[in-house]
Amino acid sequence: MIDKVKKGIEGSNATLAIILINIIVYIALITVPNIADILLLDPDKILEKPWTLVTVFFSHEWLIHIFLNMGFFFIFSRQLEKLTSSTTVLIVYLTCGFIGSLTFMPFAPLIGWSGPVVGASAAVWGVAAAFAAMRPDFLILKGKAKHWIAALFVGNTVLLVLNPQIMIGAAAHYAGIVVGLICGYWLKIREQKRSLT
């Protein structure tokens, strides 16, 4: 049993580091007074706190939120890390999360959103999408990677139709998926070129 666990996390340095940072930030958010003002993305305060474009995608508000996000992230990210490298996982996570944050910004005033947002879903879904682009038929929990991404996209759309007020979160999620797919296709092309040399 222990050997299986070791084998499962072997070579997952970036994956585990990102999960650890998310856990530390979550604990800080629920225990340290006013730290949310420093870490969460608030469109009204972005010029004062530009770093929140990054810190927001290491943040979670509820235990179930971080549990689901990090569980999903671990499953896909460790596969991407085995296939590529720790550096690649980190770059994809940061890129998808950052673009997700930027995408959120113009939608906030459209729906009259005021206050901070929280969540790593754009970054997490982006990493999953990158792996799915590279290995679309790879089986994860009895489902193909490409089907998991399709399910995320459809689910996000259904929730948006049912509640347009989540537009800002949905926009960031879409951005994460799209950027992740672009990263994954680029990595796949690079992989194919290397195999020819």
What residue spans do the PLM features occupy?
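A detector for small-residue-rich transmembrane helices and their helix-helix packing motifs
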Residues: 1-197
